[in-house]
Swiss-Prot record:
The lineage of its organism: Bacteria, Pseudomonadati, Pseudomonadota, Gammaproteobacteria, Pasteurellales. CDD domains: PseudoU_synth_EcTruA. The gene is truA. Belongs to the tRNA pseudouridine synthase TruA family. It comes from Actinobacillus succinogenes (strain ATCC 55618 / DSM 22257 / CCUG 43843 / 130Z). GO terms for molecular function: RNA binding; tRNA pseudouridine(38-40) synthase activity. This is tRNA pseudouridine synthase A. Pfam families: PseudoU_synth_1. One of its GO terms (biological process) is tRNA pseudouridine synthesis.
Length: 264
């Protein structure tokens, strides 16, 4: 039997999603809680392995078990055994063909930037602070050069293990909400650090240090060394994973925080 879960987490304390020796990971904490509920060892598969410090509001995972529990028990029982910065949002018995990673057709991220000359004392865990003013309209315009299927070598980490740098970006939207700028991007999949590398370069455009057309040039060069530094992790959220309707995977509100599903 396969069980799918929707998971939310604050990534500040964790060295990423993936289980690793001698460091704290979201996967390890969730597997420990599930194993307690199941009274057997549980191994998880996730839709997207987020990096150290990155958050998730729409992560999807699955596991296989012969243990029978009500869906409610998988959610509430697991939450009772999790730290406060990880939570199960829903639990569902999944089709035998379902796989959290390989059945996914799209991943969606949102990156939050707090634009203010002075930093905030209450926001640093969930946003990236930028003391410079940013032109979100120019950032949005520059982002449109990345739409469609392209070679994203210029925005790919050197340690990326993917066999190909080609990805298909479905949409990229940059909007302003008071002092906050939100970069909303969806693709079929992402190479390592792709979202944060894109955001870092968009911030160069937004600050006026680079022209809008620079993003098009960067994409064409296929050279990571020419792009901007990687944006910090704390502003990044995995907000949704999309699957074929036949699997019946629930869609939670995108968020994070106060953000509605539709940004204007």
């Amino acid at each position: 039997m396969k069980i799918a879960l929707g998971v939310e987490y604050n990534g500040k304390r964790y060295f990423g999603w993936q289980r690793q020796e001698k460091v704290l990971s979201v996967q390890e904490e969730l597997e420990k809680a599930l194993s307690f509920v199941a009274n057997e060892k549980i191994d998880l598969f996730c839709a997207g392995r987020t990096d150290s410090g990155v958050h998730g509001t729409g992560q999807v995972v699955h596991f296989e078990t012969e243990v029978v529990r009500p869906e409610r028990a998988w959610a509430f029982g697991t939450n009772a055994n999790l730290p406060d910065d990880i939570a199960v949002k829903w639990a569902k018995t999944a089709d035998d063909e379902f796989h959290a990673r390989f059945s996914a057709t799209a991943r969606r991220y949102r990156y939050l930037i707090y634009t203010n000359p002075l930093r905030s004392a209450v926001l640093p865990e969930g946003v990236t602070h930028c003391h410079l003013p940013l032109d979100h309209e120019k950032m949005h315009e520059a982002g449109q050069f990345l739409l469609g299927e392209n070679d994203f070598s210029s925005f790919r980490a050197a340690q990326c293990q993917s066999k190909t740098p080609w990805r298909n970006v479905h949409h990229l939207q940059v909007t302003r909400h008071g002092r906050y700028i939100v970069v909303d991007i969806q693709a079929n999949a992402f190479v390592h650090h792709m979202v944060r590398n894109i955001v870092g370069s968009l911030m160069e455009v937004g600050s006026g240090r680079q022209p809008v057309e620079w993003m098009k040039w960067l994409l064409e060069q296929r050279n990571r060394k020419l792009a901007a530094p990687t944006a910090k992790p704390q502003g990044l959220y995995l907000v949704r994973v999309t699957y074929p309707e036949r699997f019946g995977i629930p869609l939670s509100p995108l968020g994070p925080l106060f953000l509605p599903d539709e940004l204007v």
